[in-house]
Amino acid sequence: MLNMQQHPSAIASLRNQLAAGHIANLTDFWREAESLNVPLVTPVEGAEDEREVTFLWRARHPLQGVYLRLNRVTDKEHVEKGMMSALPETDIWTLTLRLPASYCGSYSLLEIPPGTTAETIALSGGRFATLAGKADPLNKMPEINVRGNAKESVLTLDKAPALSEWNGGFHTGQLLTSMRIIAGKSRQVRLYIPDIDISQPLGLVVLPDGETWFDHLGVCAAIDAAINNRRIVPVAVLGIDNINEHERTEILGGRSKLIKDIAGHLLPMIRAEQPQRQWADRSRTVLAGQSLGGISALMGARYAPETFGLVLSHSPSMWWTPERTSRPGLFSETDTSWVSEHLLSAPPQGVRISLCVGSLEGSTVPHVQQLHQRLITAGVESHCAIYTGGHDYAWWRGALIDGIGLLQG
């Protein structure tokens, strides 16, 4: 978390030089920048819930431009907002954005070589970008690596929820890996059992997108930290891998086969293979998912209420339909959500539902809020939280620990 009170005079000195367009000594400038928390964060006079955030990039060779891709702030159609400015006769590129003080999001920086077309630059804000982004070398916070080898930096401002459990480290429990037939295909499954006394009741958290949580985000160490900090009760974590991105879209979402296989076959098998453990009952059995996986979590409440006592749905893809006739960019606040209607056609009594969404996720926000209210009206225990951010593992990580914390009650 970036503390704007750290070295305020040094931050002011750098910002004043940038504003004046004159750097007294370039070597001293970069030495000072490397000693500070970058991006540089300063308060906004008269707006206590906002911050001015200054990003820096040091160019090692001539460039046409540098683009800051910040989740749901400068990405997608907002590429122009993320274009940095060069200070003449220096190697400095900079951009200052005014952001909510509670913002948490991932970002990367893209160098734009000379001769790059406007079309290529415009594509840089979306999934079809051809220019490779890099993490911010001046950002001292742990990087995030969601898929592949592309690392991103994380901006967590001072009023955002803390992410201390995700600061890296090693897990101390037992990690078991196996191949299982789930939903008709062989998949890698990871079971993490924390190092706790076998006499303690042990809950179970099931995570689709297991390869992301285990290979890229370090969920095992985070669970250990949260247990040790008494933020959550002891839980094991069961991750179910996708085979590839295409297959992920085939199996996650509103389909029932994955849910029924997990509830009817996988969980009984996993527990039977660990008979020495004191497995907690369904009240501490959790299904948690994000995006398409967020819909799968809701389907856990719909199709397996006897198995899951709590589901955590983060940024659910409320646009999803079985016919695949809808897309995120075409789904508006006034459209009917198949997801909501299907879930409410048989309200999952006895299942606690935690809905979370990023404040910058457009039409998803009102749809999630409406689903929350309708669930309550239907007699379902529903919780709803809005995190300041986008469609992003940066805050989904924290929401996972927050959601598991509901088991304390």
Swiss-Prot record:
Keyword entries, A-Z: Cytoplasm, Hydrolase
GO molecular function, one term: iron ion binding
Reactions accelerated catalytically: Fe(III)-C-5-deoxy-beta-D-glucosyl-enterobactin + H2O = Fe(III)-{di[N-(2,3-dihydroxybenzoyl)-L-seryl]-N-(C-5-[deoxy-beta-D-glucosyl]-2,3-dihydroxybenzoyl)-L-serine} + H(+); Fe(III)-{di[N-(2,3-dihydroxybenzoyl)-L-seryl]-N-(C-5-[deoxy-beta-D-glucosyl]-2,3-dihydroxybenzoyl)-L-serine} + H2O + H(+) = Fe(III)-{N-(2,3-dihydroxybenzoyl)-L-seryl-N-(C-5-[deoxy-beta-D-glucosyl]-2,3-dihydroxybenzoyl)-L-serine} + N-(2,3-dihydroxybenzoyl)-L-serine; Fe(III)-{N-(2,3-dihydroxybenzoyl)-L-seryl-[N-(C-5-[deoxy-beta-D-glucosyl]-2,3-dihydroxybenzoyl)-L-serine]2} + H2O + H(+) = Fe(III)-{N-(2,3-dihydroxybenzoyl)-L-seryl-N-(C-5-[deoxy-beta-D-glucosyl]-2,3-dihydroxybenzoyl)-L-serine} + N-(C-5-[deoxy-beta-D-glucosyl]-2,3-dihydroxybenzoyl)-L-serine; Fe(III)-di(C-5-deoxy-beta-D-glucosyl)-enterobactin + H2O = Fe(III)-{N-(2,3-dihydroxybenzoyl)-L-seryl-[N-(C-5-[deoxy-beta-D-glucosyl]-2,3-dihydroxybenzoyl)-L-serine]2} + H(+)
Main location: cytoplasm
EC number assigned by the record: 3.1.1.109
A single Gene Ontology CC term: cytoplasm
A GO biological process held by the record: iron ion transport
InterPro entries cross-referenced by the UniProt entry: AB_hydrolase_fold, Enterochelin_esterase_N, Esterase-like, Ig-like_fold, Ig_E-set, Mycobacterial_A85_antigen
Localization: Cytoplasm
Family listed: Belongs to the Fes family.
Role description: Catalyzes the hydrolysis of both the apo and Fe3(+)-bound forms of enterobactin (Ent), monoglucosyl-C-Ent (MGE), diglucosyl-C-Ent (DGE) and triglucosyl-C-Ent (TGE). Shows higher catalytic efficiencies on Fe3(+)-bound forms. The initial linear trimer products are, in turn, very good substrates for further hydrolytic cleavage by IroD, leading to complete degradation of the trilactone to DHB-Ser and/or Glc-DHB-Ser monomers. Hydrolyzes MGE and DGE regioselectively. May be the ferric MGE/DGE esterase responsible for cytoplasmic iron release.
The protein's name in its UniProt record: Iron(III) salmochelin esterase
The species this protein was found in: Escherichia coli O6:H1 (strain CFT073 / ATCC 700928 / UPEC)
Upper lineage: Bacteria, Pseudomonadati, Pseudomonadota, Gammaproteobacteria, Enterobacterales
